[in-house]
Structure formats: C-alpha cells, structure tokens
C-alpha cells in the first residue's frame, strides 16, 4: 500500500468502454480489505457475494480453475496504471501460478528460457525454429540480441485461444444445467389421485392422520405414485374439510364426508344411526316439520335446566353447608322434572306423527326407533343418584379439591339416615370454627383417623393420635388392600393390630 504512493492510479482504471464499472468478488478476509480501496479508487465494484459477470479473485495457491483470476492482476494494473488482459492471469491449475502479461514477457524473457515453456507444443515449435535458423545461418544468436517477437506473439495467441475455449465450454455446461433445472416442473395432482387419497383415508384411518405411518403405507402400496410427504401435504392443505369431490358410497358410511347432495335430505339426529342405506331420502313435509318441532322443544327444555344448574354451582361456593345441600337437592328435582317433560313431549310428537302418516308406516317406525334411542341414551346423564354415600366416598383422597368435597357433603345430607348426617355436619362445622380450618382440611383429618370424631379432634389439637400411633397415609392404605402377609405384618408393627383392624373396616364401609 505504501509502495503505491497513496493510490495514484486512474479513477477509471476498472471501468469498461461503455462506462459500466467492473465487478470483482473476493472472499471475506485480509486480502479483501487490501484490495477493496484499490478497486473502488479505480472505479470498480466489490461484490458482497458471487454474481454473474463478476471476476472471482483468489490468491495464488488457494484456488485453481479457469474461472478464478489471480490477485496479482489488480496489483499489476494499479502499478502500471493500465488495464491488462484478464486471461493472462487466470489460474488454470498450473500450481496456482498466474500467467504474466506480454510486456513482462518481452522484458524478462531471454534466449536460454525458451526451453522452460509450460506447454510441450510451444517447446517443439521453438526447437524447430531454432533448428531452421541454425541450418540457414550456421550460428547461434548472442545472449544480448533481442528476442523474436513473432514467436512470442504466436505463443500468447495460442494460450488465449485455449483459455477462451475453456471458458466457452464451462459456460455451455452451466447453461445446459440451468436449462435442465428450468425444464423440470412439479407434476400437478389430478382429480383421480385426490379421490384415491380421500378414499384410502376414509376406509383405513378416518380418525388418524397426524402421524406418518398412514402416509408411508400409502407410498408403499402405491395408492398414488407420490412421496408420502407430498401426499400428506396435499391432503391437509387441499382436501381435508373441503367438498370439492363426491366420493362413491361404501359400507362404512360413518367415516364418509358429507357431500352437497346428501345435505338436502335431512335425517333424524341420533348418536348411533342404525338406518339402512335403502331408506329413501325424500320425506313428506309433515314428518320433517314434526321432527324439527320435537328437536326444538328438546333444546328449549334442556337449555334453561343447564343454565340453572350452572348458576347453582357458582352460587354454592359462598353459601353455608345446609343451604347448599338444599339447593343441590332442588336442582336435581328440577332436572328430573324437566327430563320427564321432555320425554312426554317426545312421545306425544312421535304418536302425532304416527297418526297423521299411517300410509308411511315403515318410515315412521324407523323414526320412532331413532327417537326412542335418542331418549334412552340421553336421559341417564340427568338422573339423580339414588344410592347413599359413606364416609369413604365423602372424602376421596388427600389431593381432593375443596369444591368437590363440599358437593359430596351436600349429597350426604340427602342420604336416608338424616340424624347421622346432621350430626356429622354439626361436628364438621364445629371443628371448622374451632380450629379455623377449611372443610377439606377437616374431612382429610377425619379420614386419617378412621372416621373417629374424638381422635380427629385430638389430632387437630395436638398433631398426633391419642394412642400414640402415627397417622395413616395413602401409601399404607394402598398396601393394606394387597393380600400380602409381610406387608400386613409391617403395618401391624407400625400402627398396631387394633388400628389395622379398624382401618380395614373403615375402608370397607
């Protein structure tokens, strides 16, 4: 940099005749930092990445090939302040050594360096010329005589032709590759392939498709001649949930996607449809109207009941135990009454439809079966449990939330033995107020002490049982239910035989 005299070369050194700047590319590094000011000062451009038309500069020995140009090209052009021939500096594999320009060859080449030519053809030509000169003049030229310029010109011209041929061949190969790349286009899915994919998914895996096993099976069985990735992408992007195709009917109609034609034929809403495929799609308007009225009445009856039950659940949190128990009982009675009303209305709708349409007895019989099936399957969800709850079911475990335990206390209040439930509630409320604990904490303490109120109160006061034995834990309860003699012996040693017997009876109650 210092030898260059502070960048004294021309500002248009690396500018073409038409005024466009020459483009160069050098990999990032110290060499790029060194050449960047030289190129930009001469009017050239330094590309950040490889671009078509840019000269790829490389240090001698680092890269080889006709597409690379030695960095000595930039240094020589800046030193002479003249744009030299690029082909003389291309790295064509001669161990990374650049070719020198014609001017440097004229200055440094001597007669004794003719034998050291890199090409064998040039050596043979020069030897033939030297032999011809000897035969004519019978003497050798002195070392101080000038070199024949015609021979040097012929050698340089042959090298230029070879380099141009190499570059042209490389360009042809690159153009052919790019043409092949542009010619290859993705095959579009046909309608037949889409239908085959949808049929296979419907018949083999109607509820499965998130994994890769289904799509790999389709690729192995060659349902369509595509990769499993392409099949999966096609299904989830363009086929799933869209009604572009009408698939043929099969036996498994539950997994079939509904088409536009099928939507025009309304059918009764049932959880398990047992209507055969031979049922006609056309119905009389009277039957359809009755069915619609029946379904609307069902939803109107069930809607308020569910809203009231939700409101009751939210209000139960801030009410006392007795009021919550009464509200739960009233809500269950209201739900059962609403259920009975809906059942009666359904029966009336079915009987009315059967009277009006006696000619279509077979079709109406099918609708009656479907409606009754709908009632039988839905009514058990709203039934009030009639069995009584014991203390074990009153508290399910140590991790039970307080809201669930409060609901179970309300259900205990509706058991047949009202005196015992009232006494239990009073004892729970008294311990809650005395020790300032929640209902969940008190019931858990009661469960750990086999349901004994005195032992539970002593445990809440002192933190231990009156007899000095430890408190029962859930792991020991699970071990106690196993028929293992060693485990039973260990529990007897830990809790005592009397406590183990009481615990077995308590868990069995």
Swiss-Prot record:
Annotated region Disordered: the residues are 93-168, 249-359, 399-423
Compositional bias (Polar residues) at which positions?
Answer: 115-127, 401-418
Which coarse location class describes where this protein primarily resides? nucleus
Start and end residues of each BRCT domain: 1-91
Top-level lineage group: Eukaryota
Compositional bias (Basic and acidic residues) at which positions?
A: 159-168, 286-296, 321-344
Q: Which InterPro entries match?
A: BRCT_dom (IPR001357), Homeodomain-like_sf (IPR009057), Rap1_C (IPR021661), Rap1_C_sf (IPR038104), TE2IP/Rap1 (IPR039595), TERF2IP_Myb (IPR015010)
What the entry lists under Pfam families is as follows: BRCT_2, Myb_Rap1, Rap1_C
User: What is the residue range of the motif Nuclear localization signal?
Assistant: 493-509
Q: Name its cellular compartments.
A: Nucleus; Chromosome, Telomere
- GO CC terms for this protein? chromosome, telomeric region; cytoplasm; nucleus
Q: Which residues form the Myb-like domain?
A: 185-239
BP term (GO), one: negative regulation of DNA recombination at telomere
Keyword list (alphabetical) reads:
Activator, Chromosome, Nucleus, Telomere, Transcription, Transcription regulation
Subunit structure, per the record? Homodimer. Component of the shelterin complex (telosome). Interacts with terf2; the interaction is direct.
Function summary: Acts both as a regulator of telomere function and as a transcription regulator. Involved in the regulation of telomere length and protection as a component of the shelterin complex (telosome). Does not bind DNA directly: recruited to telomeric double-stranded 5'-TTAGGG-3' repeats via its interaction with terf2. Independently of its function in telomeres, also acts as a transcription regulator: recruited to extratelomeric 5'-TTAGGG-3' sites via its association with terf2 or other factors, and regulates gene expression.
- Which family, according to UniProt? Belongs to the RAP1 family.
Q: What is this protein called?
A: Telomeric repeat-binding factor 2-interacting protein 1
């Amino acid at each position: 940099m210092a030898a260059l005299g502070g960048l004294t070369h021309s500002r248009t050194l690396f500018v073409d005749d038409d005024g466009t700047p020459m483009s160069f590319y050098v990999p990032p590094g110290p060499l790029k930092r060194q050449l960047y000011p030289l190129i930009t000062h001469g009017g050239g451009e330094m590309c950040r990445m490889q671009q078509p038309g840019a000269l790829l500069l490389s240090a001698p020995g680092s890269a080889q090939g006709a597409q690379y140009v030695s960095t000595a090209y930039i240094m020589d052009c800046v030193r002479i302040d003249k744009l030299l021939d690029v082909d003389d500096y291309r790295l064509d594999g001669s161990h990374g050594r650049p070719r020198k320009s014609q001017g440097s060859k004229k200055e440094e080449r001597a007669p004794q360096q003719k034998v050291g030519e890199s090409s064998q053809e040039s050596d043979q030509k020069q030897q033939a010329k030297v032999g011809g000169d000897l035969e004519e003049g019978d003497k050798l030229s002195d070392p101080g005589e000038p070199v024949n310029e015609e021979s040097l010109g012929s050698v340089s011209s042959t090298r230029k032709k070879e380099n141009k041929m190499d570059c042209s061949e490389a360009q042809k190969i690159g153009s052919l590759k790019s043409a092949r790349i542009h010619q290859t286009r993705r095959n579009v899915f046909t309608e037949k392939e889409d239908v085959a994919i949808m049929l296979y998914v419907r018949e083999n895996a109607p509820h499965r498709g998130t994994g890769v096993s289904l799509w790999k099976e389709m690729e192995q069985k060659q349902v369509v001649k595509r990769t499993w990735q392409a099949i999966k992408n096609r299904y989830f992007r363009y086929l799933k949930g869209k009604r572009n195709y009408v698939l043929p009917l099969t036996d498994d109609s539950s997994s079939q996607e509904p088409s536009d034609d099928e939507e025009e034929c309304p059918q009764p809403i049932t959880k398990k449809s047992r209507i055969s495929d031979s049922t006609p799609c056309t119905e009389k308007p009277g039957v359809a109207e009755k069915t619609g009225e029946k379904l609307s009445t069902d939803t109107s009856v069930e809607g308020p009941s569910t809203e009231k039950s939700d409101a009751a659940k939210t209000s139960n949190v801030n009410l006392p135990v007795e009021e919550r128990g009464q509200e739960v009982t009233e809500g269950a009675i209201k739900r059962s009454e609403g259920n009975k009303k809906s059942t009666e209305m359904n029966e009336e709708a079915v009987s009315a439809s059967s009277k009006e349409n006696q000619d279509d007895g077979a079709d109406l019989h099918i609708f009656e079966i479907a409606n009754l099936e709908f009632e039988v399957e839905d009514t058990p969800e709203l039934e009030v449990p009639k069995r009584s709850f014991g203390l074990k079911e009153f508290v399910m475990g140590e991790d039970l939330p307080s809201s669930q335990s409060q609901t179970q206390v309300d259900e205990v209040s509706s058991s047949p033995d009202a005196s015992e439930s009232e006494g239990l509630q009073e004892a729970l409320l008294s311990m809650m107020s005395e020790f300032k604990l929640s209902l969940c904490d008190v019931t858990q303490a009661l469960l750990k002490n086999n349901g004994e109120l005195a032992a539970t109160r002593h445990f809440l006061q002192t933190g231990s049982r009156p007899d000095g034995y430890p408190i029962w834990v859930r792991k020991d309860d699970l071990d106690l239910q196993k028929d293992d003699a060693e485990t039973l012996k260990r529990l007897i040693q830990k809790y005592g035989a009397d406590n183990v017997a009481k615990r077995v009876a308590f868990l069995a109650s």
